[in-house]
Amino acid sequence: MRTLIEARYPSHGIYGEELGSVRVDAEFVWVLDPIDGTKSFITGKPLFGTLIGLCHHGVPTIGVIDQCVLKERWVGVRGVRTRLNGEEVRAAGKPALAEAMLYATTPHMFAEGFENDHFTALRGHVKRALYGCDCYAYALVASGFGADLVVEADLGLYDYAALVPVLLGAGGSMTDWNGEPLTIPRHTASKGRVCAAANAQLHAEAIEVLRDADGGDSKRKRED
């Protein structure tokens, strides 16, 4: 992917999990994650994906989630309806947080203290919490397949930039835990904390539980 981008768009920046980053202050920046969900990949669980995002002036504008085993590809473009294999999709979601299905890759991705406490509190508000879907959980939310909410922490920009246009284009909401936009300039301030929801009401209810009122942070307890 990097070779193709460099050849076709030499002025564009590239922000990648692999091989580092170049020109990240460019007008257009590609954000790449060749394999999101490495553990799923190496164990043959088809919940990993290739993530390709394009940011314009730091804002995620185009996103692709590609699951090669299941032959599923979600394409999101800001201002345009998200498509799965060419067909429009729309997030649905339960009307209340108490009925929602919550996803996260692992409960061990939340740092001890603020993150773990607030995620645990949110888990107490929902119907059920499930784990282990990696980027595929966001695709399920965008497609209206019964996943309502994804809340994660300790993410890199390459983990979520491609997901934002996919969620927004499906009618969902996706921000950091304070309800602020996920952009390149705000990546550090967002602390890798992400909240994606199938609709605005669910998102607002989740943010009320997650919101970082004091800017607190703590030691991470990450399971790589």
Model regions: which residues?
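N-terminal subdomain of lithium-sensitive/metallo-dependent phosphomonoesterases centered on the IMPase/IPPase/PAP
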Residues: 1-35, 201-202, 207-224
